[in-house]
Design a protein with these regions (language model features):
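N-terminal juxtadomain amphipathic helix
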Residues: 1-64
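A SAM-dependent methyltransferase catalytic signature shared across enzymes that methylate proteins
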Residues: 2-9, 216-234
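A C-terminal cap/extension of S-adenosyl-L-methionine-dependent methyltransferases
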Residues: 11-21, 232-289
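Acceptor-substrate binding/catalytic loop of class I
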Residues: 23, 203-217
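Short loop segments at secondary-structure junctions
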Residues: 32-33, 41, 217, 286-289
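Short glycine/proline- and charge-enriched loop/turn segments
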Residues: 63-66, 198-207, 246-253
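Conserved SAM-binding loop and adjacent beta-strand
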Residues: 66-81
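Conserved SAM-binding loop
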Residues: 77-198, 211-225, 238, 277-286
Length: 289
């Protein structure tokens, strides 16, 4: 489902380096303060853009230097994610991970004593998750069986940008959240320094899998429409480094580790003043709660 009718400003043209090699425009939506990938694939055609050994978010094995960095960073970020969630809730809270992939975060939360389950559209990812621990990750249709106002926390770790109908999904997830509950939403930030540096080669544009590209201003507007508000934000420090590493390959045809480390360092350094980190986690609550 198309979210916007006002894709009214060409911003950049990007290539799908990971899978298809196709070119897509990024158009700035002045009313929403965000970018939209244009044209957007039909929902039925989206899955083909995820069917590649180069697309690693659902992968199990290391095949390259970037894969090794990705898996190492994932371990560190899961610890940080658990820390952010635990700062709001005691053990035993109910956590729904929307877009759970192969279930790493769900299993980690369960190991910490939380009641946690995941929802995931990709059947292969669900099969991997449930082979490690049965009945951990379910098809997204399972959302209809979840009781309203039953979840202490709902997490979307780099998921929102993939959702064709993200506003409808957020509205549905809001109904599942307890009055005192929180949404934890991580998204890339196209206003970051590393995005500006790499331009069309910035790996976090990841067209056309990333249908939307958010700014802090866009996130404030989105949740204001839902009668929710951003309570706080957390920087995802490591994203600047591994996104920069993959971006160097898109830019030059090979990984440039030292350049990636330098650009990642500069991005995080500049963000200490601007707040524009490569990726941000938004902690969102119901207004007046």
């Amino acid at each position: 489902m198309e979210q916007h009718n006002t894709h009214n400003g060409f911003f950049l043209q990007c290539t799908d380096y990971a899978v298809s090699g196709e070119a897509f425009d990024l158009c700035y939506d002045f009313s929403e303060h965000m970018l939209a990938t244009t044209p957007q694939p039909k929902i039925a055609a989206l899955s083909k853009y995820y069917n590649s050994s180069s697309y690693i978010s659902h992968a199990k094995h290391r095949k390259s230097i970037f894969d090794s960095v990705y898996f190492s960073v994932r371990k560190l970020t899961i610890k940080r994610k658990l820390k952010w969630v635990s700062s709001c809730y005691c053990e035993g809270a109910s956590i729904l991970d929307f877009g759970a992939g192969v279930g790493h975060f769900v299993r980690s939360a369960q190991a910490k004593g939380w009641v946690s389950m995941g929802l995931e559209t990709n059947q292969k990812a669900r099969n991997i998750a449930n082979s490690k621990k049965p009945a951990t990750v379910f098809d997204t249709n399972h959302i209809e069986s979840i009781k309203p106002q039953s979840q202490s926390a709902i997490t979307l770790w780099h998921v929102l940008e993939h959702l064709p109908d993200y506003k409808q999904q957020l509205n549905k997830l809001k109904t599942l959240l307890k009055p005192s509950g929180r949404l934890f939403i991580a998204v890339p930030n196209f206003r970051s320094y590393d995005a500006a540096y790499f331009q069309q080669h910035w790996a976090a544009y990841d067209v056309p899998r990333h249908l939307w590209h958010f700014s802090k201003k866009a996130m404030v507007s989105i949740f204001d429409e839902l009668d929710m508000e951003i309570e706080r934000t957390h920087p995802m420090i490591f994203d600047a480094f591994y996104v920069s590493l993959l971006s160097t390959k898109y830019q030059s045809g090979r990984y440039k580790l030292f350049k990636a480390l330098w650009v990642g360092f500069l991005s995080n350094l500049k963000a200490t003043k601007t707040g524009e980190y490569s990726s941000l986690v938004f902690v969102v609550k119901h207004k007046n709660n």
